[in-house]
Amino acid sequence: MERIKGFISTVRLMVMALFLRLKAGSWDKVVFHGKVTFEHWRDGQLLYTETGTNTFTTEGMAKLLNIIFHDISKAASHIWYVGIFKNNITPALADTGAKLGSGNAYGECQDADYDSPLTNRPAYTTEDTTTAVITNVNAKAHFVMNASITVYGAFLADAAAKTAATGTLMCAKRFGTPRAVIADDEIYVTYQITCTTS
């Protein structure tokens, strides 16, 4: 009888452990994955392309949560912009918009570095989605270079001006291979953001 009770106790513990494991299963999580594709063109020829994951900042994730679940409204027009940077820096979770702009940690590229578009960063132009993926693949961020520099990476921020060191840095990516560009080279950046439960 004691052996049967012990067996039943063991089974009960196993069932409870399984229940707790299932309760904490992958479907109760929401994870954002950022995939960045970088293209470097010269004279109409694709010189280099790479795709990799980026770092979502704490500041950026807080912005998402506040728009979705709190009281921060989202602009009716573009809210995110793509920028590129020329300092040898690896994006970190604690990075903020204060590291962008002219002369700050990221060394954001300015009009002297790329002159199309002038003044402002290109908009992150997406389309309505009915899936868990949003991307600017049909309207890639396009930069026409104006100088011989090395481009180290790209980012998403919510301020339009290249000089802006305010607002939110959503995410950033240091390229696996920094690119030495010259005047009239073209850079295209595609950001794909996936929301998943795993």
Question: What are the roles of these predicted feature ranges?
Answer:
Residues 1-152, 158-198:
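Small cysteine-rich, disulfide-bonded extracellular modules of the LU/uPAR three-finger superfamily
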